[in-house]
Amino acid sequence: MKAKVVINLVKINKKIIPDKIYVYRLFNDPEEELQKEGYSIYRLAYENVGIVIDPENLIIATTKELEYEGEFIPEGEISFSELRNDYQSKLVLRLLKENGIGEYELSKLLRKFRKPKTFGDYKVIPSVEMSVIKHDEDFYLVIHIIHQIQSMKTLWELVNKDPKELEEFLMTHKENLMLKDIASPLKTVYKPCFEEYTKKPKLDHNQEIVKYWYNYHIERYWNTPEAKLEFYRKFGQVDLKQPAILAKFASKIKKNKNYKIYLLPQLVVPTYNAEQLESDVAKEILEYTKLMPEERKELLENILAEVDSDIIDKSLSEIEVEKIAQELENKIRVRDDKGNSVPISQLNVQKSQLLLWTNYSRKYPVILPYEVPEKFRKIREIPMFIILDSGLLADIQNFATNEFRELVKSMYYSLAKKYNSLAKKARSTNEIGLPFLDFRGKEKVITEDLNSDKGIIEVVEQVSSFMKGKELGLAFIAARNKLSSEKFEEIKRRLFNLNVISQVVNEDTLKNKRDKYDRNRLDLFVRHNLLFQVLSKLGVKYYVLDYRFNYDYIIGIDVAPMKRSEGYIGGSAVMFDSQGYIRKIVPIKIGEQRGESVDMNEFFKEMVDKFKEFNIKLDNKKILLLRDGRITNNEEEGLKYISEMFDIEVVTMDVIKNHPVRAFANMKMYFNLGGAIYLIPHKLKQAKGTPIPIKLAKKRIIKNGKVEKQSITRQDVLDIFILTRLNYGSISADMRLPAPVHYAHKFANAIRNEWKIKEEFLAEGFLYFV
């Protein structure tokens, strides 16, 4: 079904587009230039109208004469239409900025209607990100509202003006750290650079460089007597104890990621994602930053009404979308109490009702797990731990202890005993069943401060003493809201290093998600969701798709190059079969690599060999291969290599989750824009928020070492949509990403975070890392 939806794009007047473009070759490397003295490459970009500098140091300009002191040579004159589409869009974006329509100007307009807000030590600043998309020969400005979370203190203040503390801070936060230059009106965000092998930050203690970049800001941005006084009031005199930090642009969209610049700790503040903050602060900030579609739309309309220019339209654009058919919603198969595989619709229940029968309700049919891992069947006893955060109130601790015990009883009585008795009746046709899991009265209750390193170490020591000689343990953890996601991650990782799979339940859930009929229990669906998640982590799967893909296998990959004690890890691969059943999860171990890059020929060859170890041959098969992000040229070469070596037909496309396009409607749909497909596979159930589409682009068929580019078809879109139904982390919610991509990314993150790799668990689909 078709519909019209407003999106965050406005049409650009074609009068801005030049007839002629001039191309120049730049001889000196911008990076070398920066090391010598400074910023001529930046001055070139700022002081000449209409400049785009490509990764190969070609200058694309609207002007015939450049004011530039470096070495370059004119290469020719071309028409605008001869430029590649991406360079056309970059140049139009630059011309908009030079006509007074830039991120800085639009962000100022936005803040008339949505003020910055302070949350403790953090300030949340509404801002605008801009990009340009070419669609049907017209250009559109994408206006995306974001919220930047930044420290109230400068980086230099945060580290107590101590160079050693600065280095430690940068090392500790190197994965996610972004720094904003607050002494520039552009407020550009940068990412610090680190040494290739030592991973230490690239710091320069040369006082001349520090003075140069301090004075650069004054001369460029604060060059009137009044402005200089304001600069000194805000930032003080230059502190020559601080080192300069070599950094690169954080945005890969607007600027060449290889360009470097020096930052002064005195003039920058760290910026954050909400996930990096303590959860109580993060929750407040996330609540503030969530905007309903109508709220976003209204803010953009207010901005456009303030723009005094005819270069862009004053109204947001509409686009035609295709709604996802309702019959695709519940495409799953389950096993009934006789062990037969049936569509869930035949049992007249929904996915969210898979476990309702465990409350001894005759209203709901018994549903057996679709498959139980052999490894899990053989375990006779699993130690059970209840871990309580001492920061919780006593009544919450007592409630959590009792609730976790009841959940365990549900697993033991309803799942283990009843499944086994039912399974015995069904053994003639199916080998189904859970082991007898004897938790009764044997759980260990541990209470410690989970917000402290000492408390976490104490938990690990106590669990370790109980896990001697045991293959697998299970822990339910009650944690306060104040714990950051990093602390959650550390606790779960340390427990799994002892073979203990854990399930965290936070304070909000324990306090606010009570059953309305029995305040001594959690809400019924919350209980079943927790059971579903725990059993998924233990490898127990309750359903497959009632749908067949036109592929032998679907594989999600993620690249995570790093040195581990057991060898060099290149990343992860997660395999699903043609009916959406998760078959194998494997780490890709490869030979020693140089730097952060991975030899993708070796990566994909190892992937094929790894699956072969489990008697899954990819030779002569057709596979759909997906990853989170763009398939790089290096990865494409690797796929050409295995397609020829093993006679594999590979279909792949980019699956991009981070982009600025938003559609102001909360429904499952897809639309074509600028040669890409934007798919919204989920509908938000929460009170606030705007659905974020995933972008599907650049479909390739790789066969016999050759690449054929094709358009993404409606069937491709439906395949991706169906793959988002395979969520083992929630009994009812939909996923934003297709399942193979989601789980490959989760496992790659676990590898990066030093989780123990248990290949015997992974081989049977244990999702312990989720």
Swiss-Prot record:
The active site is at residues 558, 596, 628, 745. It comes from the Archaea. Optimum temperature is 87-99.9 degrees Celsius, has very low activity at 37 degrees Celsius after 16 hours. Can be used to create artificial restriction enzymes using denatured tDNA with appropriate guide DNAs. Multiple gDNAs can be used in a single reaction. This is particularly useful when cloning a region without any known restriction enzyme sites. Disruption phenotype: 2-fold increased plasmid transformation efficiency. Mn(2+) 1 binds at residues 558, 628, 745. Residues 276-361 are annotated as: Interdomain connector. Mn(2+) 2 binds at residue 558. Its cofactor is Mn(2+). GO terms for molecular function: DNA binding; DNA endonuclease activity; manganese ion binding; RNA binding. Residues 473-756 form the Piwi domain. Probably binds 2 Mn(2+) per subunit; only 1 is seen in the structure. Mn(2+) is the preferred cation for cleavage, Co(2+) can be used but not Mg(2+), Ca(2+), Cu(2+), Fe(2+) or Ni(2+). Monomer. Has 4 domains; N-terminal, PAZ, Mid and PIWI. The N-terminal, Mid and PIWI domains form a crescent-shaped base with a stalk rising from the end of the N-terminal domain that holds the PAZ domain above the cresent. A groove is present in the center of the crescent closed off by the PAZ domain, in which the putative active sites are found. The PIWI domain assumes an RNase H fold and has the catalytic residues. This is Protein argonaute. It comes from Pyrococcus furiosus (strain ATCC 43587 / DSM 3638 / JCM 8422 / Vc1). The lineage of its organism: Archaea, Methanobacteriati, Methanobacteriota, Thermococci, Thermococcales. The gene is ago.
